[in-house]
């Protein structure tokens, strides 16, 4: 971990060339750097046009600069932004000048956000929400990440923690009274009622069955089947572009091909696999092995043709939909859903002409809707969050059971519950975890 007496900088926009590039700075050297480049500090929080100059006084670029004195800034430190033209030459010159300034260095991944966290601008759940927002592929993922970034889980966790501490204070006050006789019931009874109410609220959040986590991770659909069944053609139809090579020769697909889709706002990853068959070709054998492995891990398998159904069913516990392809070559075949069995529906399509695809797509959207559920009520988006909420709930249960054994035990369990929520928020004993979380961010964020 780098010391905070160093000022960090990074290109926060996309790769050049581009219309505009944004270079961010954070730390005690942000103001002096801005002064060196522009000749003076601009008014705080006001976009100001300025000519940037190098150390010889030669112009670099005509820019828009912003100055945010800390602590009223995104990171809690002095922050500057340089909005320049996004040419490689401008950015290279600017980065070279900044690198040569004293106590100035390039930022690590997620370091701006980490400084915001360490300066109390955001908690860890909000930082995770920001990471999810950056990586959101669909509108539903965006809305969920934004709820997290706005502190939906963090605010609840802080409220729960404060109430647990107050309940513990009531019990500990009762312990103090016990030195003079029995523990007053008027202290213990409301504390217990408070704890039970908190436990019910946390258990309700935990009972959401990981819906928000599912939305963050997405749904995986594997297209499997024998060689030359039209799997790659179906993949291209679903993606509405050519992502897989289509050939009349069997065994064209040797490796897994993945494409991310947005189905009515739901994130779906579709995977095209090698044709499953017996073969002596070692390369194709590896492709078949990977196909079987991915089918076993999939949330849904689309099996083209009905050959080897039993063999596939033994390899996956998940749902299988059978898709009869190439109906354009079968005069009497009817397109669309030809079986409505909820366990293994059968669809008749032509991946080449698109016949029957609307029914298959409609069914996929319905499957995704059921799979993700009512995600707008989900608060937990990561296993880490679920772990600490589960620890909190377990400690609250133990505190209720411990009251009859001794108020000291109940108070200790409440301290454990408050500690777990502190870890959820990133305020207690999480130093080792921070490197892992912020490493997922991009440079400049």
Swiss-Prot record:
Residues that coordinate or bind Mg(2+): 232, 253
Enzyme class: hydrolase
Gene3D superfamilies membership: P-loop containing nucleotide triphosphate hydrolases, Probable tRNA modification gtpase trme, domain 1, tRNA modification GTPase MnmE domain 2
Localization, UniProt: Cytoplasm
UniProt KW keywords: Cytoplasm, GTP-binding, Hydrolase, Magnesium, Metal-binding, Nucleotide-binding, Potassium, tRNA processing
Protein family per UniProt: Belongs to the TRAFAC class TrmE-Era-EngA-EngB-Septin-like GTPase superfamily. TrmE GTPase family.
Functional description taken from the UniProt entry: Exhibits a very high intrinsic GTPase hydrolysis rate. Involved in the addition of a carboxymethylaminomethyl (cmnm) group at the wobble position (U34) of certain tRNAs, forming tRNA-cmnm(5)s(2)U34.
Protein name (record): tRNA modification GTPase MnmE
The organism of origin for this protein: Bradyrhizobium sp. (strain BTAi1 / ATCC BAA-1182)
Gene symbol of the encoding locus: mnmE
């Amino acid at each position: 971990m780098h010391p905070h007496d160093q000022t960090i900088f990074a290109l926060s926009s996309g790769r050049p060339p581009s219309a505009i590039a944004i270079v961010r700075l954070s730390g005690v050297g942000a103001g002096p750097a801005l002064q060196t480049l522009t000749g003076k500090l601009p008014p705080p929080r006001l976009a100001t046009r300025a000519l940037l100059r190098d150390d010889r006084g030669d112009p670099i670029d005509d820019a828009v600069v912003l100055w945010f004195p800390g602590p009223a800034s995104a990171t809690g430190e002095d922050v500057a932004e340089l909005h320049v033209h996004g040419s490689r030459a401008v950015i290279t010159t600017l980065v070279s000048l900044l690198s040569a300034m004293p106590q100035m260095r390039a930022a690590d991944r997620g370091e701006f956000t980490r400084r915001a966290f360490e300066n109390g601008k955001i908690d860890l759940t909000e930082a995770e929400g920001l990471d999810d927002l950056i990586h959101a592929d669909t509108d539903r993922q965006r809305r969920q990440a934004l709820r997290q970034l706005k502190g939906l889980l963090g605010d609840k966790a802080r409220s729960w923690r404060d109430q647990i501490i107050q309940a513990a204070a009531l019990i500990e006050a009762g312990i103090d009274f016990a030195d003079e006789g029995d523990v007053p019931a008027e202290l213990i009874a409301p504390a217990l009622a408070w704890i039970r109410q908190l436990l019910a609220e946390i258990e309700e959040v935990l009972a959401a069955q990981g819906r928000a986590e599912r939305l963050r991770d997405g749904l995986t659909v594997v297209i499997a089947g024998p060689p030359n069944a039209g799997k790659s053609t179906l993949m291209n139809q679903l993606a509405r572009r050519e992502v897989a090579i289509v050939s009349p020769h069997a065994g064209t697909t040797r490796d897994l091909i993945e494409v991310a889709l947005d189905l009515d706002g739901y994130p779906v990853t579709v995977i095209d696999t090698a044709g499953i068959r017996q073969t002596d070709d070692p390369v194709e054998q590896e492709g078949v092995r990977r196909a079987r492995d991915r089918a076993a891990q999939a949330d849904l398998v689309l099996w083209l043709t009905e050959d080897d159904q039993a063999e596939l069913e033994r390899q996956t516990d998940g749902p299988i939909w059978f898709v009869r392809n190439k109906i354009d070559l079968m005069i009497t075949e009817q397109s669309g859903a030809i079986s409505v069995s909820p366990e293994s529906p059968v669809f008749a399509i032509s991946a080449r002409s698109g016949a029957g695809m609307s029914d298959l797509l409609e069914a996929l959207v319905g499957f995704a809707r059921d799979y993700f559920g009512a995600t707008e009520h989900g608060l937990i988006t990561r296993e880490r969050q679920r772990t600490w909420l589960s620890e909190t709930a377990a400690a609250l249960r133990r505190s209720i059971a411990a009251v009859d054994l001794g108020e000291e035990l109940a108070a200790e369990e409440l301290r454990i519950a408050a500690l777990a929520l502190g870890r959820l928020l990133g305020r207690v004993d999480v130093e080792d975890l921070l490197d892992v979380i912020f490493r997922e961010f991009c440079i400049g964020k």
